[in-house]
């Protein structure tokens, strides 16, 4: 910016760099998606096209931003995780959130015709998302956050599956279905599904029950193999002085990440096994790219 008498306005800008040496999670949510899903006749309780579209947009975001370690999505929300050592945009919250949200929204609209082939084209108001950034100081905090989202997915999906079965197959209206489910537990909902409608909840698609996890796929580590453990990752990433990699190492890691395939899986991310078999998610160091068959 050229020097001028107007340059003083820069003094009003507020620094918004996020805490150093903490995991950054940028979570986005659809704005007004209840009306949006009605407008485009999303299937209830789950529309596979809509979920596949969300996953495609998330993959595209991760492809454009190698700094993202892992992402998790369910319904109209997605969480993107940056490693503690991330220095992208000098860790400025406004830059990170706006980049994630705008890139995701752009790809959501871009991929729409691929997944909603027979439906009407998008028209205003167009789909949009809001976002926020939260810092988590430890690996356990991060894992608890991810577990919270997946548990929330299960609870909501079981309720919605039962609720819409009562409406679509049981002939109830929304008020009656809601009243019937009031105060019920998971076992009660499973019993309603099975006894009334012959639905075994365990046979529902994994994506509906567990959500979607997106990450770069490297060679899996066998349980018990000596790699970077969670405790070691915790110790390395929680030191008072954040690790600073050389420029050459940063470039090397970036090249490895671009070679890795970005996958969408529907796995249990609460259990230790998921993380133990993919130590690169916590260590911040890329794994070994699988050989092509």
Swiss-Prot record:
The protein depicted here goes by the name: tRNA(His) guanylyltransferase
Query: Cofactor comment in the record?
Result: Binds 2 magnesium ions per subunit.
Q: Which cofactors does it use?
A: Mg(2+)
> What is its biological role?
Adds a GMP to the 5'-end of tRNA(His) after transcription and RNase P cleavage.
Native source organism of the sequence? Neurospora crassa (strain ATCC 24698 / 74-OR23-1A / CBS 708.71 / DSM 1257 / FGSC 987)
Where on this chain does Mg(2+) 1 bind? 29-30, 76
Q: What is its EC number?
A: 2.7.7.79
UniProt keywords, alphabetically? GTP-binding, Magnesium, Metal-binding, Nucleotide-binding, Nucleotidyltransferase, Transferase, tRNA processing
Look up keyword Aminoacyl-tRNA synthetase and say if it applies. Answer: no
Checking PANTHER family in the record gives: TRNA(HIS) GUANYLYLTRANSFERASE-RELATED
Give binding positions for Mg(2+) 2: 29, 76
């Amino acid at each position: 910016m050229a020097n001028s008498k107007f340059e003083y306005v820069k003094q009003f800008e507020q620094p918004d760099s996020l805490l150093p040496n903490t995991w950054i999670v940028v979570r986005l949510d659809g704005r007004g998606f209840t009306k949006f899903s009605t407008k485009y006749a999303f299937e209830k309780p789950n529309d596979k096209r809509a979920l596949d579209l969300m996953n495609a947009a998330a993959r595209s975001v991760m492809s454009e931003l190698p700094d993202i370690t892992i992402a998790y999505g369910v319904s109209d929300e997605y969480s993107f995780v940056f490693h503690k050592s991330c220095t992208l945009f000098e860790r400025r919250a406004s830059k990170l959130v706006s980049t994630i949200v705008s890139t995701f929204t752009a790809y959501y609209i871009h991929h729409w015709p691929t997944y909603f082939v027979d439906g009407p084209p998008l028209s205003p108001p167009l789909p949009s998302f809001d976002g926020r950034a939260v810092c988590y100081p430890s690996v356990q905090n991060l894992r608890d956050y991810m577990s919270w989202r997946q548990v929330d997915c299960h609870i909501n999906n079981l309720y919605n599956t039962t609720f819409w079965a009562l409406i679509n197959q049981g002939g109830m209206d929304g008020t009656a279905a809601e009243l019937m489910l009031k105060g019920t537990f998971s076992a009660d909902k499973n019993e309603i599904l099975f006894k009334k409608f012959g639905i075994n909840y365990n046979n529902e698609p994994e994506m509906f029950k567990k959500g979607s996890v997106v990450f770069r796929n490297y060679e899996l580590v066998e349980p018990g193999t000596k790699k970077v453990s969670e405790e070691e990752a915790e110790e390395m990433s929680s030191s008072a002085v954040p690790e600073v990699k050389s420029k050459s190492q940063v470039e090397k890691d970036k090249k490895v990440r671009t070679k890795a395939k970005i996958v969408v899986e529907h796995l249990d991310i609460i259990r230790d096994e998921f993380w133990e078999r993919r130590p690169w998610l916590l260590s911040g160091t890329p794994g070994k790219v699988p050989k092509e068959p």
